[in-house]
């Protein structure tokens, strides 16, 4: 045992790889290495058909804005089932057109609403507006032919 102690074995056994207080700290937003918008995602979905891509991207920008307004209303009214339903809907739409960071954040909100974690919903819901705005800017630049 003396040889193990000399090599630091006992120190290793008593160390933790993280501070346990970090486990209880809430997350303000889902850390996301995902891109705000992946322009190849829409092509993987519908192929190289530019007209179809344009139509789906245009529809996403309009319907996502409406869905986001619904999420904001559900959040303001503390309506967890509606928040979950709308977050699920926006998640699917966002991922299909390549708004990956928005889709991931919607997934986190949907999961929090499903778990009835109101505190987490309170932190996540307001972050969607900024992610949608960033995604919309990139998508609209593509639609206008500048990206």
Regions found by a protein language model. Name each.
Residues 3-147:
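Two-component system phosphorelay core
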């Amino acid at each position: 045992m003396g040889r193990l102690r000399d090599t630091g074995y006992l120190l290793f056994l008593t160390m933790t790889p993280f501070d346990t207080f970090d486990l209880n700290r809430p997350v303000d937003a889902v850390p996301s290495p995902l891109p705000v918008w992946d322009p190849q995602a829409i092509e993987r979905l519908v192929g190289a058909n530019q007209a179809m891509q344009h139509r789906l991207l245009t529809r996403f920008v309009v319907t996502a804005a409406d869905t986001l307004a619904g999420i904001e209303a559900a959040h303001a009214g503390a309506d967890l089932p509606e928040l979950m339903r709308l977050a699920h809907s926006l998640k699917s739409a966002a991922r299909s057109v390549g708004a990956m960071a928005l889709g991931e954040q919607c997934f986190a909100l949907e999961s929090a609403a499903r778990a009835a974690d109101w505190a987490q919903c309170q932190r996540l819901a307001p972050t969607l507006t900024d992610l949608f705005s960033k995604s919309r800017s990139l998508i609209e630049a593509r639609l206008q032919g500048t990206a």
